[in-house]
Amino acid sequence: MSEDIFDAIIVGAGLAGSVAALVLAREGAQVLVIERGNSAGAKNVTGGRLYAHSLEHIIPGFAESAPVERLITHEKLAFMTEKSAMTMDYCNGDETSPSQRSYSVLRSKFDAWLMEQAEEAGAQLITGIRVDNLVQRDGKVVGVEADGDVIEAKTVILADGVNSILAEKLGMAKRVKPTNVAVGVKELIELPKSVIEDRFQLQGNQGAACLFAGSPTDGLMGGGFLYTNENTLSLGLVCGLHHLHDAKKSVPQMLEDFKQHPAVAPLIAGGKLVEYSAHVVPEAGINMLPELVGDGVLIAGDAAGMCMNLGFTIRGMDLAIAAGEAAAKTVLSAMKSDDFSKQKLAEYRQHLESGPLRDMRMYQKLPAFLDNPRMFSGYPELAVGVARDLFTIDGSAPELMRKKILRHGKKVGFINLIKDGMKGVTVL
């Protein structure tokens, strides 16, 4: 194998890497994917929601054969204090097109399936091997060094996840700052399919996506999540790494307290813990974007910081898929002209501008807006406090609704309310 020269070597068999391999292999390119895990998806962790649009036009109708868990039709967004919660609930009963849908997924299953599609198209996969270094010649990346072997390629796509050491060694990415990432922990809790459907008011393959702000992260930047799978629940939380030194609790303790919350405990009661995982999550959006292109090399997916936390939606998988496709299209174009220079591979960024970078640029100020302690302490307390007063009748003299809202608003501060509101309008 060391004597072969591949058209592309892809480091990482996650979504970006697998899609890049699939698109390249379909066009007859010689592709090698190197994955350090024992299988595709073995080391990949996600909360669990895939927006279908970017994969739908690559594999139309993929959900009919892919191991998706449930079609998300129910959305819940909750503001939580230590013992209470105020929840907004949305149920989508309308018929949607395939590209408008989203699904809960388990990456170990889904990534393995996606890589199988790439292999069937002609891509080669090696697992259980770590790429130690990139091979350079005259300033151009010409291959990789893995397990003592040098494997050459016309181009290399780095899809090796957040905190890519290889990109850092090339000088294309800086060492990840604590302000740019979060720590995510997740439990997979097993329950009978019928119990999940009863508790979340689901029918058939319908699923629910629930996000929680406030007490899950002890008032620090981050939040909790819960996604329904076919016969498991994906439950976890994400907390900004740079805030953990201010935390009064450890992340595992935050998760335990989250599970005991009155709004969560009944949903997971009687469940069996079948898996625990942890992961570092890119949080700064376009503000942590590395140099995407070099001579003979491209960076895609989490390695490029392609993740967006909008508070009400969290995107990463669809961006990774779009980036993988863009990287593959760029390499195919380079193959036609036999030009793998940085200048030629710059087409990659042009492809991204019509998808991931467009979306990330629109919300580039949002990470700084969310990095505000009031978002995860003051405002959840405000929402819960107003809801409590609205629904509590104790026989005392009634109070106008506006007075109830104003009374709780004073705790946040009216200047802060105005300031945060104006900033939110400009950001969103």
Curated annotation (Swiss-Prot):
Keywords: Electron transport, FAD, Flavoprotein, Oxidoreductase, Transport
Molecular-function GO terms, alphabetical: FAD binding; oxidoreductase activity
Domain of life: Bacteria
Annotated SUPFAM superfamilies: FAD-linked reductases, C-terminal domain (SSF54373), FAD/NAD(P)-binding domain (SSF51905)
Cofactor(s), by name: FAD
Cross-referenced InterPro entries: FAD-bd, FAD/NAD-bd_sf, FixC-like
Family statement drawn from the similarity comment of this UniProt entry: Belongs to the ETF-QO/FixC family.
Protein name as catalogued: Protein FixC
Organism: Escherichia coli O157:H7
